[in-house]
Curated annotation (Swiss-Prot):
Key words of the record: Ribonucleoprotein, Ribosomal protein, RNA-binding, rRNA-binding
PANTHER family: 50S RIBOSOMAL PROTEIN L4, LARGE RIBOSOMAL SUBUNIT PROTEIN UL4M
Protein name: Large ribosomal subunit protein uL4
Family assignment from sequence similarity: Belongs to the universal ribosomal protein uL4 family.
HAMAP family: Ribosomal_uL4_B (MF_01328_B)
InterPro entries reported for this sequence: Ribosomal_uL4, Ribosomal_uL4-like, Ribosomal_uL4_dom_sf
Subunit structure as annotated in this protein's UniProt entry: Part of the 50S ribosomal subunit.
Organism (species): Shewanella loihica (strain ATCC BAA-1088 / PV-4)
Residue ranges, annotated region (Disordered): 45-71
UniProt KW Membrane keyword: no
Role description: One of the primary rRNA binding proteins, this protein initially binds near the 5'-end of the 23S rRNA. It is important during the early stages of 50S assembly. It makes multiple contacts with different domains of the 23S rRNA in the assembled 50S subunit and ribosome.
GO molecular function: rRNA binding; structural constituent of ribosome
GO cellular component: ribonucleoprotein complex; ribosome
Amino acid sequence: MELVLKDAQSALEVSETTFGRDFNEALVHQVVVAYAANARQGTRAQKTRAEVTGSGKKPWRQKGTGRARAGTVKGPIWRGGGVSFAAKTQDHSQKVNKKMYRGALKSILSELVRQDRLVVVESFGVEAPKTKELKAKLKDMKLEDVLIVTPEIDENLFLAARNLYKVDVRDVAGIDPVSLIAFEKVLVTADAVKQIEEMLG
């Protein structure tokens, strides 16, 4: 199959297994959920009545004081006491096989091609790290909400895009399922397409 280059009167020959496969919604959903879960920190901790610092001594005798009976100062109803159902650190990570992950990326890339959301160009960059220059270039291409994928991070391009809310720059190694579906369009260079094919086999 061929992908038409937007900035040249030519087309790029690509593998149908990477850019022309059927969309597997269940697989993409599973991988995206796992990716988001793996990004969770999960670090939270509260202490139960067994873990708070304090004496184990009964605060006052059972009868005769006129006060409500109490057996510990570490109970949940006491100020400084433990929490009834204390939250603990959790590991939210989900395992995703390499084959599944690559399959999800192929599914997403193929769907981007079908929906005409994948824009392939011969090359892309800016001469200076100027946001204004990049904005004008994207406007000429009628792109606003876009992920730019290059073989390696170009510093000028990265700095120019840093202040644009709906623009992100990634190298091929930095793409992931969430970033690919988060933007309206994905702008990718011809060299990056070849690298993606090599990476996904």
